[in-house]
From Swiss-Prot:
Record's protein name: Phosphatidylserine decarboxylase proenzyme
Posttranslational mods: Is synthesized initially as an inactive proenzyme. Formation of the active enzyme involves a self-maturation process in which the active site pyruvoyl group is generated from an internal serine residue via an autocatalytic post-translational modification. Two non-identical subunits are generated from the proenzyme in this reaction, and the pyruvate is formed at the N-terminus of the alpha chain, which is derived from the carboxyl end of the proenzyme.
Main location: membrane
Similarity annotation: Belongs to the phosphatidylserine decarboxylase family. PSD-A subfamily.
Phylogenetic lineage: Bacteria, Pseudomonadati, Bacteroidota, Bacteroidia, Bacteroidales
Amino acid sequence: MKVHKESTGLLVSMATLFTGICLSLFYFLGASIVSYLVMIIAIFLYLLTINFFRCPKRHSPFANDDRAVVAPADGKIVAIEEVSENEILHERCIQVSIFMSIFNVHANWFPCEGKVTHVSHKNGHFIAAYLPKSSTDNERSAIVIKTEKGARILARQIAGALARRIVTYAEVGDICSVDAHMGFIKFGSRVDVYLPLGSQVEVKMDQKTVGNQTLIARLPE
């Protein structure tokens, strides 16, 4: 399993900082309990960060299925409801939300096959991502995908209390695949998917999801 490219700068900075601290402690304090304790803590934090930025290579069993909508992220289903999406789509939709804890893979996949027709970013707050109001109040990025049959799917990356940086790779005009990454969110967050009414939801509340693998819905025929 490789480490995500978004980790490069942070891991280099952490390695430099931790190495400097440990060398200084061993120089001034020698091989003391404090020196070894700090070194162990530094190694633990570094390995924890590597684990957070892990980036598994996956191939979806639903690639090329024009009705399939897959989970864009690892996590847990925290909302399934009919809502009015008034910010971008301006229509009634089915919202399926996935909460990502700091222990989940934080790469985000495209939820369906199609063409990107809209990408935007909006500043906001950083309240806990598992709360419903995070969908409308938090900093977020939005990606709209139009399928071959004309359905519009909105995927919204939402920052959380710890996740204060959203990275979006999608650009308007991109032809997207469920096997491709649409972005990355650092340190705990949420992804909302807005589906056309009439879509058949295939997940339940509190169900665990695997990005790119779990079928969350089938679009209307």
